Amino acid sequence: MVRVLNDIHQHKSLILNVDGGCEPKNPGGIATCGWVFFDGKNKVLADDYRVVRDGGPLATNNFAEYCALGLALRWLKEQNWRGNLFIRADSKLLVEQVN
């Protein structure tokens, strides 16, 4: 469930951090992801985390990383927010494919 701490509409620019992982094994573990929107002063505006797949061959780190990005962007679209978005991620694959 998304936790909203501050109104994103008061900001023209947002920073989005996304992350995902699969434990205790990759592939086949429990894939989880999370995202956080910050303002320009590192103040948390909204965040979420969840299990996105519980086992099976599709439960991978890469799947979880992309879920984090997709869920965050979907939520942002639902808020009808417009502005500049800066995305930060530690997944080399995600960064290179999205950039």
Predicted segments with their positions:
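RNase H-like nuclease fold core
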Residues: 2-63, 74-79
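RNase H catalytic domain
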Residues: 21-27, 69-99
